From Swiss-Prot:
Enzyme Commission number(s) of this protein: 2.1.2.9
Gene: fmt
Organism ancestry: Bacteria, Bacillati, Actinomycetota, Actinomycetes, Micromonosporales
Positions contributing to (6S)-5,6,7,8-tetrahydrofolate binding: 109-112
Protein name: Methionyl-tRNA formyltransferase
Organism: Salinispora tropica (strain ATCC BAA-916 / DSM 44818 / JCM 13857 / NBRC 105044 / CNB-440)
InterPro entries per record: Fmt (IPR005794), Formyl_trans_C (IPR005793), Formyl_transf_N (IPR002376), Formyl_transf_N_sf (IPR036477), Formyl_transferase-like_C_sf (IPR011034), Met-tRNA-FMT_C (IPR044135), Met-tRNA-FMT_N (IPR041711)
Catalytic reactions of this protein: L-methionyl-tRNA(fMet) + (6R)-10-formyltetrahydrofolate = N-formyl-L-methionyl-tRNA(fMet) + (6S)-5,6,7,8-tetrahydrofolate + H(+)
Amino acid sequence: MRVIFAGTPAVAVPTLAAVAASRHDLVAVLTRPDAPAGRGRGLSRSPVGAWADEHGIEVLTPARPREPEFLDRLRALAPDCVPVVAYGALVPPAALEIPRHGWVNLHFSLLPAWRGAAPVQHALLHGDELTGASVFQLEEGLDTGPVYGTVTDEVRPADTSGDLLERLAHSGAELLIAVLDAIEEGSARAEPQPNDGVSLAPKLTVADARVRWGDPAFAVDRRVRACSPAPGPWTTFRDERVKLGPVTLVAGGPELRPGELLVEKSRVLAGTASTPVQLGEIRAAGKKAMPASDWARGVRVTAGEVLA
């Protein structure tokens, strides 16, 4: 089939590479426009756009996919199908109807669970033990289309959202290629999503990434892992923001108030609503990440001081 790949962030690149290596004819890539990045805020190509440039593939970057010029180019390219991974913009009906097999989206959850922009983060934040990826027919609703297939993945105790997303990016790419092959062969079957089990996964904000020391230890651990690497878990110490690395659940341990710090010889503990957690790395503003014990010695944590 003639296909145009739609995607933007780095997590979409494994699927783009798989599509390019498949039996299908990749005629163009659709991605979000170049955006300011880095300290200089210069315009930067999306990871998907950069990959396509390196491989000599046409890149389409409409500000809005309803623009007449884009729709005209889409018709001229005449794709049979448009596979999508995290494109980042709503696709209007006028664009959805151009490919004869429509737009087929890879989403990183077991739909109808966690519809929205941050499915992996919400799976970790809510303590899911099993998650996965789904390939479904894109339609106007938010991740509501019929599902062609799924792949599952067990959540590991130390998984961050980055870890889990990396695994799903590769297993999901294999799933999407299998669905494209089945569509071409006429054997693909999409099943409507059930009405039960629907949950939403809006993008996590910087405010969401602030650690709540008044939560139980398991919830603190989930939030830290869900927000790693982005938007990045953080807290405050002496009214200054610091970023946190992984934390470790501690069996038993001393009784500490929520956020209260205890510096021991080889570890730093922080209190929660239940048992303490052991802090891993800490990065103060303008500094490199360092082991929590080194940070505590450097700032000279005193008895009773707290993270907030």
